[in-house]
């Protein structure tokens, strides 16, 4: 299968990584390799590319083969960024990029089971070795747990109705395909909700997050990224939904202002020191022109921070 991957907020990403010759950068979400390719073009540097999907990793490695040993592909979840960096014999890196969510390659491949618009198996695993699939979640989770997931991870207002419909239907026959599930979700929501965004969008997002343990991975990945950054190194994160963006925003805030002393204390006694300086006080978003060219960019938000020299 061919990639049709268009990197989001490309120029903004390059600008905020503050590239320099001789630097080492981690593209923690390699995907189609578009961001990595531009980094390697713009500076005489090295890029370590992480992806947990071996198919995506192999495609990107072919795309970036002209850069020779300046590109280092590694099959790994970015929650393991510290282990990867140290295993490669690197003490620290000059920048980390995280472009979150599902890559175009995964979305456009029905066999991956991420899309509610193309029929495929209920899979949704970013790492094919992950034992948990979307079918496991949909067919075995108790109704209360489905409601919680749809509320928390999908911010879906009709979570109870959808969960009830899923449980009722699976008692007769388990769900096996993405379109089966999408059609059941459409039937479960009120008619007015069907006229807005596709009714299955939030539920599919929630199931995907559960299958891949995405929020915990992001928390661990952010912590690891800060630890492997050199002083003055940058971390750039692109998010695609409010849960991710809120998590990144709050993490950056905590790292910039970590003091937990009561406000009426005359001085800090907790000993917690800031490790980051936030570069983007407000998230950067794509221009109308970029959104016209790439509809998948419409919900993207970019946040960046720099590691402090005394951290």
Swiss-Prot record:
Entry binding sites for S-adenosyl-L-methionine: 33-35, 51, 78, 99, 106
EC number: 2.1.1.199
Annotated catalysed reactions: cytidine(1402) in 16S rRNA + S-adenosyl-L-methionine = N(4)-methylcytidine(1402) in 16S rRNA + S-adenosyl-L-homocysteine + H(+)
UniProt subcellular location: Cytoplasm
Gene Ontology molecular-function annotations: rRNA (cytosine-N4-)-methyltransferase activity
Family affiliation: Belongs to the methyltransferase superfamily. RsmH family.
PANTHER family: 12S RRNA N4-METHYLCYTIDINE METHYLTRANSFERASE, S-ADENOSYL-METHYLTRANSFERASE MRAW
Protein name: Ribosomal RNA small subunit methyltransferase H
Organism: Carboxydothermus hydrogenoformans (strain ATCC BAA-161 / DSM 6008 / Z-2901)
């Amino acid at each position: 299968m061919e990639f049709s991957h268009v990197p989001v907020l490309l120029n903004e990403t390059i600008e905020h990584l503050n590239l320099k010759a001789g630097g080492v950068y981690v593209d923690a979400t390699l995907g189609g390799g578009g961001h990595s390719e531009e980094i390697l073009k713009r500076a005489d540097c090295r890029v370590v590319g992480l992806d947990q999907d071996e198919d995506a990793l192999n495609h990107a490695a072919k795309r970036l083969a002209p850069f020779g040993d300046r590109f280092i592909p590694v099959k790994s979840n970015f929650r393991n960024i510290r282990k990867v960096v140290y295993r490669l014999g690197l003490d620290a890196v000059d920048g980390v990029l995280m472009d979150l969510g599902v890559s175009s390659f995964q979305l456009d491949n029905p066999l991956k089971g991420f899309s509610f618009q193309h029929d495929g198996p209920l899979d949704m695993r970013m790492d094919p070795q992950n034992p948990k699939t979307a079918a496991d979640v949909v067919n075995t989770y108790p109704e209360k747990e489905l409601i919680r997931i749809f509320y928390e991870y999908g911010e879906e207002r009709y979570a109870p109705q959808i969960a009830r419909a899923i449980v009722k239907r699976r008692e007769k026959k388990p769900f096996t395909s993405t379109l089966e599930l999408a059609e059941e979700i459409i039937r479960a929501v009120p008619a007015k909700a069907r006229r807005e965004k596709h009714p299955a969008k939030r539920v599919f997002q929630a199931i995907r997050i559960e299958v891949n343990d995405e929020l915990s991975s992001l928390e661990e990945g952010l912590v690891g990224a800060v630890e492997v950054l050199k002083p003055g190194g940058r971390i750039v994160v692109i998010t695609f939904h409010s849960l991710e963006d809120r998590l990144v925003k709050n993490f950056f805030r905590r790292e910039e202002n970590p003091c937990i002393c009561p406000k009426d204390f005359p001085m800090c006694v907790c000993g917690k020191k800031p490790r980051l300086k936030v570069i983007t006080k407000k998230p950067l978003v794509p221009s109308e022109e970029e959104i016209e060219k790439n509809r998948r960019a419409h919900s993207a938000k970019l946040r960046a921070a720099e590691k402090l020299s005394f951290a």
